[in-house]
Amino acid sequence: MVVKAIARNSIGRNGVGAFVFPCRKITLQFCNWGGSSEGMRKFLTSKRLDKWGQEFPWIQFEVMRKSGHPLLRAEYTNGREKVICVRNLNIDNVENKLKLLKDSDGDILRRRTKNDNVESLNSSVRGIWSPLHAAKRHRI
C-alpha cells in the first residue's frame, strides 16, 4: 500500500530565533477617473510608495487600476485578508491606513475579556522571560 503525502502550503510561524513578517502582500486599488480616488492617486504619483518598497522588500506591493472606490487589500501569512476602503482620504491618511495594514498580524479581532490583561504598577518578581535571551541550557 502506497502512502501519499497531503499537498498543503506551510503556514509561516514565529518561534525561537526566527521572525516571519505577517504581512505578505498589499494591493493598492484605485480608479483613474473617480474623485474619491484622488488621495490614492496622489500617493501613487509621489515617491512614497517607492520608499515603502525599499524599506520593506519582503512585502509585495501590487497596484491595480479598477473602477470603484479605492481600496487597500493586505494578505497575511496565516491565509487571512484585510480590506480597507480609503475613499475621499488625503495622501497622509492613505499612508496611515497602509501602515495600519502593515503592522497588523491578520488575526480576527476579538473582544478581550475581563481577565485577559493584567496591569500592575510593580515590575514582575521573576522578570520577563524571552526565549532569545535565555541561557543555552534552557533552550529546547
From Swiss-Prot:
Keyword field: Mitochondrion, Ribonucleoprotein, Ribosomal protein
UniProt-recorded name of the protein: Large ribosomal subunit protein mL43
Note: Present with 3400 molecules/cell in log phase SD medium.
Family annotation (InterPro entries): Ribosomal_mL43 (IPR039927), Ribosomal_mL43/mS25/NADH_DH (IPR007741), Thioredoxin-like_sf (IPR036249)
Organism lineage string: Eukaryota, Fungi, Dikarya, Ascomycota, Saccharomycotina
UniProt-listed PANTHER family: 39S RIBOSOMAL PROTEIN L43 (PTHR21396), LARGE RIBOSOMAL SUBUNIT PROTEIN ML43 (PTHR21396:SF2)
Name of a matching Pfam family: L51_S25_CI-B8
GO BP terms in the entry: cell redox homeostasis; mitochondrial genome maintenance; mitochondrial translation
UniProt organism field: Saccharomyces cerevisiae (strain ATCC 204508 / S288c)
GO cellular component assignments: mitochondrial inner membrane; mitochondrial large ribosomal subunit; mitochondrion
Assembly and binders: Component of the mitochondrial large ribosomal subunit (mt-LSU). Mature yeast 74S mitochondrial ribosomes consist of a small (37S) and a large (54S) subunit. The 37S small subunit contains a 15S ribosomal RNA (15S mt-rRNA) and 34 different proteins. The 54S large subunit contains a 21S rRNA (21S mt-rRNA) and 46 different proteins.
Annotated knockout phenotype: Has a respiratory growth defect. Shows complete loss of growth on nonfermentable carbon source and a gradual loss of mtDNA with replicative cell growth and an increasing number of generations.
Gene name of the record: MRPL51
Single GO term (MF): structural constituent of ribosome
Compartments, as annotated in UniProt: Mitochondrion
Family according to the record: Belongs to the mitochondrion-specific ribosomal protein mL43 family.
SMART domains the UniProt entry points to: L51_S25_CI-B8
Function: Component of the mitochondrial ribosome (mitoribosome), a dedicated translation machinery responsible for the synthesis of mitochondrial genome-encoded proteins, including at least some of the essential transmembrane subunits of the mitochondrial respiratory chain. The mitoribosomes are attached to the mitochondrial inner membrane and translation products are cotranslationally integrated into the membrane. Also has an extraribosomal function, being essential for mitochondrial genome integrity. May interact with MHR1 to take part in the mtDNA repair mechanism.
